[in-house]
A protein has these predicted regions:
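Non-catalytic signal-transmission and effector/linker regions of two-component phosphorelay proteins
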Residues: 1-10, 113-127
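Two-component/phosphorelay signaling modules centered on CheY-like receiver
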Residues: 18-36
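Acidic, metal-coordinating helix/loop segments flanking the phosphotransfer/catalytic sites
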Residues: 37-55, 117-119
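Acidic catalytic/metal-coordinating carboxylates
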Residues: 39-43, 66-72
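Active-site residues of response regulator receiver
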Residues: 59
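Alpha4 helix (beta4-alpha4-beta5 surface) of REC/receiver domains from two-component response regulators
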Residues: 69, 91-123
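Hydrophobic/aromatic residues positioned on beta-strands within the core alpha/beta folds
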Residues: 86-88
């Protein structure tokens, strides 16, 4: 199991599903992350005015501002462009899904053992 110094890494989790948000936040907290959560892309952008997360995990399909729009905004902002972004999606469209089209650094399918995927993705993203 990936274990980081308890105060060393901050993650921002963005998902409109309370169940997914809770699952991902709990998973990260158990591995020593400090975690902040938002329910949509607009709320996440507001939080990022004062937060400097080490990683952002975001759903793709959300109301108000989708994950695709959030990722685009983050990658176009020099202040947040280098933060690793993990996109969560229940969709897989052909060879490229919405996460890849949005320029996410990593993507995870919600329908397949999300915790195992998070474990391996965090190891890649944060070493």
């Amino acid at each position: 199991m990936l274990k980081l110094e308890s105060s060393s890494k901050l993650a921002l989790v963005v998902d409109d599903s309370m169940l997914i948000r809770h699952t991902v936040c709990r998973f990260l907290e158990e591995r020593g992350f400090q975690v902040e959560a938002a329910t949509n892309g607009l709320e996440a952008l507001e939080m990022l005015a004062t937060l400097e997360p080490d990683i952002i995990i975001t759903d793709i399909q959300m109301p108000r501002m989708s994950g695709v729009e959030l990722i685009s905004a983050l990658k176009n902002d020099p202040r947040t462009a280098e933060i690793p972004i993990v996109a969560l999606s229940s969709l897989k469209c052909g060879a490229r899904g919405p996460a890849e089209d949005a320029r996410a650094d990593f993507s995870i399918l919600k329908d397949i053992d999300i915790e195992a995927q998070l474990e391996s993705t965090l190891a890649l993203a944060l070493g």
